Amino acid sequence: GQKTGFFLDQKYNRLAMQRICKGKKVLDCFTHMGTFALNAGIAGAVDVTGLDISEYAVSQAEANARLNHLENNVHFRQANVLDELPKLAQTGEKYDVVILDPPAFTKSREATKNAIKGYREINMKGLKLVKDGGYLATCSCSHFMTQELLAKTVKEAAKATHKRLRQVEFRTQAPDHPILWAADESYYLKFFIFQVVDEK
């Protein structure tokens, strides 16, 4: 991976996704090694697509699918997510579950304003692909993007795409990545699961 190879801080969030993926059509964006996609497949998702810009990551994800005997229903494709999602929307593609696990859009306080635009954009693009009554899982791994700020940004994305959100779950990093109250930067991972309903 870009840092650690498997991102163990997300391990329980992947398990949480299993509860809503059985029998579903799933899109995993920024899939990297395919870990969210594979967990969806293990849970019984009928059709899973993982997207990542890295050719190497996609090859590793495909190998992981084969190792887990999931190659029949879990597939990966090299693509720039920001470009690919609008193309999928134009063709009328819809998913029961869309997962957004982007790399950190900001690593400094000064860049937070631009990061907010990035998170808003990717969530708008993702929301357009969620079926009425489906689910969006979205997260940020930057400690500068606080829980409140991420929630506000996703809410703005929902308003812009005429969607209503029902928060199903809020999660953070695994316990072996402890949050130290004396070190703000230790609280970096925020993970929301929303049910998405079209505005009537």
Task: Please state what every model-predicted region is.
Residues 1-44:
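Glycine-rich adenosyl-nucleotide cofactor-binding module
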Residues 17, 40, 119-122, 126-127:
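Class I S-adenosylmethionine-dependent transferase superfamily signal
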Residues 44, 66-71, 159-164:
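Short helix-capping segments at alpha-helix termini
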Residues 47-52:
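Conserved SAM-binding motif I beta-strand of class I
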Residues 56-99:
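S-adenosyl-L-methionine
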Residues 70, 130-132:
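Helix-to-beta-strand junctions that scaffold the AdoMet/dcAdoMet cofactor pocket
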Residues 95-125:
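Mobile active-site "lid"/loop adjacent to the S-adenosyl-L-methionine
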Residues 121, 135-200:
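C-terminal catalytic and target-recognition region of SAM-dependent MTase-like enzymes
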